[in-house]
Amino acid sequence: MKYTILSLILIQFFASRAQAPKYSNEFLHLGVGAQAFAMGNAVAASSEDVTAGYWNPAGLTSATEWLQVSAMHSEYFAGIAKYDYVGVSHSLGKKGVLGFTFLRFGVDDIPNTTQLIDNDGRINYDNVTTFTAGDYAFMGSYAKSLAIPGLSLGGTVKVIHRRVGDFAKSWGFGLDAGVKYRLNSHWKFGLVARDATSTFNAWIFNLSQDMQQVFLSTGNEIPTNGLELSLPRFITGISYNHSIGNPDKGFNIAAELDIDATTDGMRNTLIKSNTFSLDPHMGVQLSFKELVKVRGGVSSIQQFKAIDGSSSWGVQPNLGLGVGIKGFNLDYAFTRLGAAEAGYYTHVFSLKFKLSQPKKK
Protein backbone atom coordinates (compact mmCIF):
# COMPACT_ATOMS: atom_id res chain seq x y z
CA MET A 1 0.00 0.00 0.00
CA LYS A 2 2.87 2.33 0.87
CA TYR A 3 4.43 2.06 -2.57
CA THR A 4 1.06 2.18 -4.31
CA ILE A 5 0.57 5.62 -2.80
CA LEU A 6 4.06 6.66 -3.84
CA SER A 7 3.51 5.59 -7.43
CA LEU A 8 0.59 8.03 -7.70
CA ILE A 9 2.64 11.04 -6.64
CA LEU A 10 4.21 11.64 -10.05
CA ILE A 11 0.98 12.11 -12.03
CA GLN A 12 -0.72 13.93 -9.15
CA PHE A 13 2.18 16.37 -8.93
CA PHE A 14 2.21 17.22 -12.62
CA ALA A 15 -1.56 17.50 -12.75
CA SER A 16 -1.46 20.04 -9.93
CA ARG A 17 1.09 22.14 -11.82
CA ALA A 18 -1.45 22.61 -14.62
CA GLN A 19 -3.75 24.46 -12.20
CA ALA A 20 -3.34 27.80 -10.44
CA PRO A 21 -1.49 26.97 -7.19
CA LYS A 22 -2.92 28.00 -3.83
CA TYR A 23 -0.43 26.36 -1.50
CA SER A 24 2.99 27.05 -2.97
CA ASN A 25 6.26 26.18 -1.20
CA GLU A 26 4.33 24.90 1.81
CA PHE A 27 7.41 23.04 3.04
CA LEU A 28 8.80 26.46 4.01
CA HIS A 29 6.02 26.80 6.59
CA LEU A 30 6.57 23.51 8.44
CA GLY A 31 8.87 25.16 10.98
CA VAL A 32 12.24 24.32 12.52
CA GLY A 33 13.34 23.25 15.99
CA ALA A 34 11.54 20.94 18.40
CA GLN A 35 11.13 23.83 20.84
CA ALA A 36 8.94 25.73 18.37
CA PHE A 37 6.98 22.62 17.34
CA ALA A 38 6.13 21.90 20.98
CA MET A 39 4.86 25.47 21.44
CA GLY A 40 2.58 25.36 18.42
CA ASN A 41 5.09 27.34 16.32
CA ALA A 42 4.27 30.44 18.39
CA VAL A 43 7.79 31.91 18.60
CA ALA A 44 7.79 35.01 16.37
CA ALA A 45 8.41 37.25 19.39
CA SER A 46 10.44 34.93 21.63
CA SER A 47 12.85 33.21 19.21
CA GLU A 48 16.31 34.43 20.23
CA ASP A 49 18.74 31.81 19.01
CA VAL A 50 20.01 30.42 15.71
CA THR A 51 16.49 29.27 14.73
CA ALA A 52 15.42 32.93 14.59
CA GLY A 53 16.96 33.01 11.12
CA TYR A 54 13.89 31.05 10.09
CA TRP A 55 11.19 32.33 12.50
CA ASN A 56 12.04 36.03 12.78
CA PRO A 57 15.45 37.19 11.55
CA ALA A 58 15.32 40.19 13.91
CA GLY A 59 15.63 37.77 16.84
CA LEU A 60 19.15 36.81 15.74
CA THR A 61 20.48 39.88 17.58
CA SER A 62 20.11 37.87 20.81
CA ALA A 63 22.40 35.11 19.47
CA THR A 64 25.48 36.85 20.84
CA GLU A 65 27.75 33.80 20.89
CA TRP A 66 30.54 33.58 18.34
CA LEU A 67 28.80 30.60 16.76
CA GLN A 68 25.52 28.74 17.25
CA VAL A 69 24.66 25.55 15.40
CA SER A 70 21.33 23.73 15.30
CA ALA A 71 20.12 20.60 13.51
CA MET A 72 16.86 18.70 13.27
CA HIS A 73 15.55 15.55 11.62
CA SER A 74 11.97 14.34 11.46
CA GLU A 75 9.97 11.87 9.42
CA TYR A 76 6.35 11.98 8.31
CA PHE A 77 3.81 9.48 6.95
CA ALA A 78 5.45 6.40 8.47
CA GLY A 79 8.90 7.47 7.31
CA ILE A 80 7.92 8.09 3.68
CA ALA A 81 8.80 11.80 3.84
CA LYS A 82 11.92 13.15 5.54
CA TYR A 83 12.43 16.70 6.75
CA ASP A 84 15.87 18.03 7.70
CA TYR A 85 17.15 21.36 8.97
CA VAL A 86 20.58 22.83 9.71
CA GLY A 87 21.12 26.36 10.98
CA VAL A 88 24.22 28.40 11.80
CA SER A 89 24.56 31.90 13.27
CA HIS A 90 27.67 34.03 13.76
CA SER A 91 27.88 37.17 15.87
CA LEU A 92 29.72 40.15 14.42
CA GLY A 93 29.61 42.08 17.67
CA LYS A 94 28.18 45.57 17.27
CA LYS A 95 27.96 45.03 13.51
CA GLY A 96 25.11 42.55 13.90
CA VAL A 97 24.55 38.81 13.46
CA LEU A 98 24.69 36.61 10.36
CA GLY A 99 22.65 33.45 9.93
CA PHE A 100 22.33 30.58 7.47
CA THR A 101 19.48 28.08 7.23
CA PHE A 102 19.20 24.94 5.11
CA LEU A 103 15.95 22.99 4.68
CA ARG A 104 15.14 19.79 2.83
CA PHE A 105 11.80 18.03 2.55
CA GLY A 106 11.93 14.97 0.35
CA VAL A 107 10.47 11.63 -0.59
CA ASP A 108 13.01 9.11 -1.86
CA ASP A 109 12.66 5.93 -3.92
CA ILE A 110 9.28 6.75 -5.47
CA PRO A 111 8.33 4.05 -8.01
CA ASN A 112 7.81 5.44 -11.52
CA THR A 113 5.16 3.13 -12.97
CA THR A 114 4.28 5.21 -16.03
CA GLN A 115 5.98 2.61 -18.24
CA LEU A 116 4.76 -0.44 -16.32
CA ILE A 117 2.67 -1.58 -19.29
CA ASP A 118 4.79 -2.02 -22.40
CA ASN A 119 3.82 -1.46 -26.04
CA ASP A 120 2.36 -4.96 -26.26
CA GLY A 121 0.01 -4.32 -23.35
CA ARG A 122 1.90 -6.58 -20.97
CA ILE A 123 3.00 -5.73 -17.44
CA ASN A 124 6.78 -5.49 -17.29
CA TYR A 125 8.19 -4.74 -13.84
CA ASP A 126 11.64 -4.23 -15.33
CA ASN A 127 10.34 -0.90 -16.65
CA VAL A 128 9.67 0.38 -13.13
CA THR A 129 12.32 2.84 -11.97
CA THR A 130 12.58 5.09 -8.91
CA PHE A 131 13.06 8.80 -8.43
CA THR A 132 13.26 11.41 -5.67
CA ALA A 133 11.01 14.40 -5.12
CA GLY A 134 12.85 16.97 -3.03
CA ASP A 135 12.35 20.56 -1.93
CA TYR A 136 15.41 22.58 -0.85
CA ALA A 137 15.79 26.03 0.66
CA PHE A 138 18.97 28.03 1.26
CA MET A 139 18.39 31.06 3.48
CA GLY A 140 20.85 33.79 4.44
CA SER A 141 19.92 36.21 7.23
CA TYR A 142 21.24 39.39 8.80
CA ALA A 143 20.03 41.21 11.92
CA LYS A 144 21.10 44.32 13.79
CA SER A 145 19.99 46.20 16.89
CA LEU A 146 18.87 49.78 16.34
CA ALA A 147 19.55 52.92 18.35
CA ILE A 148 16.15 52.61 20.01
CA PRO A 149 16.63 50.34 23.05
CA GLY A 150 15.02 46.93 22.60
CA LEU A 151 14.34 47.36 18.87
CA SER A 152 15.98 45.19 16.20
CA LEU A 153 15.50 44.52 12.51
CA GLY A 154 16.37 41.54 10.36
CA GLY A 155 16.03 40.20 6.84
CA THR A 156 16.35 36.87 5.05
CA VAL A 157 17.13 36.08 1.43
CA LYS A 158 15.74 32.72 0.27
CA VAL A 159 16.85 30.62 -2.68
CA ILE A 160 14.54 27.68 -3.35
CA HIS A 161 15.17 24.61 -5.47
CA ARG A 162 12.52 21.97 -6.10
CA ARG A 163 13.08 18.84 -8.12
CA VAL A 164 11.01 15.83 -9.15
CA GLY A 165 13.38 13.22 -10.55
CA ASP A 166 14.55 14.19 -14.02
CA PHE A 167 11.03 15.24 -15.01
CA ALA A 168 10.71 18.69 -13.45
CA LYS A 169 12.73 21.25 -11.56
CA SER A 170 12.39 24.83 -10.42
CA TRP A 171 14.44 27.64 -8.94
CA GLY A 172 12.90 30.38 -6.86
CA PHE A 173 13.77 33.50 -4.92
CA GLY A 174 12.14 35.36 -2.04
CA LEU A 175 12.62 37.76 0.86
CA ASP A 176 11.53 37.73 4.51
CA ALA A 177 11.69 40.69 6.88
CA GLY A 178 11.24 40.92 10.63
CA VAL A 179 11.15 43.39 13.49
CA LYS A 180 11.33 42.71 17.20
CA TYR A 181 10.81 44.94 20.20
CA ARG A 182 11.62 44.11 23.82
CA LEU A 183 9.54 46.41 26.01
CA ASN A 184 10.99 45.19 29.32
CA SER A 185 12.01 41.97 31.04
CA HIS A 186 8.45 40.62 30.65
CA TRP A 187 7.03 41.70 27.29
CA LYS A 188 8.34 41.11 23.76
CA PHE A 189 6.69 41.78 20.41
CA GLY A 190 7.48 40.46 16.95
CA LEU A 191 6.32 41.08 13.39
CA VAL A 192 7.40 39.01 10.40
CA ALA A 193 6.64 39.45 6.70
CA ARG A 194 7.19 36.11 4.97
CA ASP A 195 7.56 36.23 1.20
CA ALA A 196 7.39 40.00 1.60
CA THR A 197 7.68 40.71 -2.12
CA SER A 198 6.01 37.41 -3.16
CA THR A 199 8.28 34.41 -3.69
CA PHE A 200 8.39 32.91 -7.17
CA ASN A 201 9.38 29.52 -8.54
CA ALA A 202 10.19 29.11 -12.24
CA TRP A 203 9.29 25.56 -13.32
CA ILE A 204 10.87 23.68 -16.22
CA PHE A 205 9.44 20.31 -17.30
CA ASN A 206 11.22 17.58 -19.21
CA LEU A 207 8.79 14.82 -20.13
CA SER A 208 9.59 12.13 -22.66
CA GLN A 209 7.18 11.38 -25.49
CA ASP A 210 6.23 8.09 -23.82
CA MET A 211 5.41 9.85 -20.55
CA GLN A 212 3.38 12.51 -22.35
CA GLN A 213 1.37 9.75 -23.99
CA VAL A 214 0.66 8.24 -20.57
CA PHE A 215 -0.59 11.60 -19.33
CA LEU A 216 -2.94 11.97 -22.29
CA SER A 217 -4.26 8.41 -22.03
CA THR A 218 -5.04 8.88 -18.33
CA GLY A 219 -6.90 12.15 -18.86
CA ASN A 220 -4.22 14.45 -17.41
CA GLU A 221 -2.99 17.69 -18.90
CA ILE A 222 0.63 17.90 -19.97
CA PRO A 223 2.25 20.55 -17.75
CA THR A 224 4.04 23.49 -19.32
CA ASN A 225 6.85 25.71 -18.07
CA GLY A 226 5.66 28.56 -15.91
CA LEU A 227 5.87 30.59 -12.70
CA GLU A 228 4.47 29.70 -9.29
CA LEU A 229 3.96 32.50 -6.77
CA SER A 230 3.81 32.48 -2.96
CA LEU A 231 1.89 35.52 -1.74
CA PRO A 232 2.96 37.43 1.40
CA ARG A 233 2.18 36.08 4.86
CA PHE A 234 2.31 38.30 7.96
CA ILE A 235 2.92 36.96 11.46
CA THR A 236 2.45 38.99 14.63
CA GLY A 237 3.54 37.70 18.02
CA ILE A 238 3.34 38.82 21.62
CA SER A 239 5.29 37.05 24.36
CA TYR A 240 5.16 37.31 28.15
CA ASN A 241 7.93 36.06 30.43
CA HIS A 242 7.84 35.83 34.24
CA SER A 243 10.41 34.49 36.69
CA ILE A 244 9.46 32.93 40.00
CA GLY A 245 12.26 33.81 42.39
CA ASN A 246 15.80 34.28 41.13
CA PRO A 247 15.76 33.96 37.30
CA ASP A 248 18.99 31.93 37.36
CA LYS A 249 18.03 29.64 40.24
CA GLY A 250 14.26 29.28 40.12
CA PHE A 251 11.37 28.69 37.79
CA ASN A 252 10.44 30.69 34.72
CA ILE A 253 7.23 30.66 32.72
CA ALA A 254 6.86 32.06 29.21
CA ALA A 255 3.80 32.23 26.98
CA GLU A 256 3.25 33.51 23.46
CA LEU A 257 0.34 34.15 21.12
CA ASP A 258 0.95 34.43 17.37
CA ILE A 259 -1.47 35.22 14.56
CA ASP A 260 -0.66 34.27 10.96
CA ALA A 261 -2.35 36.37 8.29
CA THR A 262 -2.31 34.80 4.81
CA THR A 263 -3.23 36.76 1.68
CA ASP A 264 -3.96 33.97 -0.82
CA GLY A 265 -7.69 33.70 -0.24
CA MET A 266 -9.89 31.66 2.06
CA ARG A 267 -8.22 28.96 4.15
CA ASN A 268 -9.60 26.62 6.79
CA THR A 269 -8.71 28.82 9.77
CA LEU A 270 -10.50 30.35 12.74
CA ILE A 271 -11.08 33.67 10.94
CA LYS A 272 -11.36 33.69 7.16
CA SER A 273 -12.61 35.68 4.20
CA ASN A 274 -12.29 35.58 0.43
CA THR A 275 -9.16 37.75 0.54
CA PHE A 276 -7.30 36.79 3.72
CA SER A 277 -7.33 34.33 6.63
CA LEU A 278 -6.18 34.60 10.26
CA ASP A 279 -4.73 31.59 12.05
CA PRO A 280 -3.98 32.03 15.79
CA HIS A 281 -1.68 29.63 17.63
CA MET A 282 -0.16 29.74 21.09
CA GLY A 283 2.40 28.07 23.30
CA VAL A 284 3.73 28.01 26.86
CA GLN A 285 7.05 26.95 28.41
CA LEU A 286 7.93 26.20 32.02
CA SER A 287 11.65 26.02 32.77
CA PHE A 288 13.82 25.38 35.81
CA LYS A 289 17.29 26.98 35.96
CA GLU A 290 17.46 26.79 32.16
CA LEU A 291 18.22 23.09 32.67
CA VAL A 292 14.83 21.43 32.14
CA LYS A 293 11.95 22.82 30.10
CA VAL A 294 8.40 21.54 29.64
CA ARG A 295 6.41 22.90 26.72
CA GLY A 296 2.93 22.77 25.28
CA GLY A 297 1.03 24.49 22.52
CA VAL A 298 -2.13 24.65 20.44
CA SER A 299 -2.26 25.25 16.68
CA SER A 300 -4.28 24.49 13.53
CA ILE A 301 -7.68 25.59 14.78
CA GLN A 302 -9.84 24.26 11.95
CA GLN A 303 -13.42 23.33 11.13
CA PHE A 304 -14.35 19.84 9.95
CA LYS A 305 -17.45 18.50 8.28
CA ALA A 306 -18.83 15.06 9.03
CA ILE A 307 -20.52 12.72 6.56
CA ASP A 308 -23.94 13.71 7.90
CA GLY A 309 -23.23 17.36 7.05
CA SER A 310 -22.61 18.54 10.60
CA SER A 311 -19.47 20.50 11.41
CA SER A 312 -17.19 20.77 14.42
CA TRP A 313 -14.00 22.53 15.42
CA GLY A 314 -10.70 20.79 16.08
CA VAL A 315 -7.28 21.86 17.32
CA GLN A 316 -3.82 20.37 17.18
CA PRO A 317 -2.15 19.81 20.57
CA ASN A 318 1.64 19.82 20.83
CA LEU A 319 3.91 18.72 23.66
CA GLY A 320 7.65 18.72 24.27
CA LEU A 321 10.65 18.67 26.58
CA GLY A 322 14.05 20.33 26.57
CA VAL A 323 17.33 19.77 28.41
CA GLY A 324 20.23 22.23 28.45
CA ILE A 325 23.75 21.71 29.83
CA LYS A 326 26.66 24.12 29.34
CA GLY A 327 25.72 25.48 25.95
CA PHE A 328 24.27 22.21 24.67
CA ASN A 329 20.52 21.78 24.20
CA LEU A 330 18.48 18.72 23.29
CA ASP A 331 14.81 19.32 22.49
CA TYR A 332 11.94 16.95 21.78
CA ALA A 333 8.43 17.53 20.45
CA PHE A 334 5.43 15.30 19.91
CA THR A 335 3.37 16.87 17.17
CA ARG A 336 1.67 16.06 13.92
CA LEU A 337 1.61 17.16 10.33
CA GLY A 338 -1.67 17.87 8.61
CA ALA A 339 -5.20 18.69 9.66
CA ALA A 340 -5.98 18.71 13.36
CA GLU A 341 -8.19 15.62 13.12
CA ALA A 342 -6.54 13.84 10.22
CA GLY A 343 -2.83 14.48 10.72
CA TYR A 344 -0.08 11.99 11.48
CA TYR A 345 1.77 12.17 14.78
CA THR A 346 5.53 12.36 14.64
CA HIS A 347 8.46 12.63 17.03
CA VAL A 348 10.82 15.54 16.42
CA PHE A 349 14.30 15.89 17.91
CA SER A 350 16.64 18.84 17.51
CA LEU A 351 20.09 19.73 18.79
CA LYS A 352 21.66 23.10 19.44
CA PHE A 353 25.07 24.07 20.77
CA LYS A 354 27.05 27.27 21.26
CA LEU A 355 30.73 27.87 20.60
CA SER A 356 32.97 30.63 21.90
CA GLN A 357 35.54 32.30 19.71
CA PRO A 358 38.84 30.42 19.80
CA LYS A 359 41.47 32.26 21.77
CA LYS A 360 44.40 33.56 19.78
CA LYS A 361 47.76 32.23 20.85
Specify the residue positions occupied by each region the protein language model found:
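Bacterial Sec-dependent N-terminal signal peptides
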Residues: M1-K22, V284
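Subset of outer-membrane beta-barrel
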Residues: Q19-K361
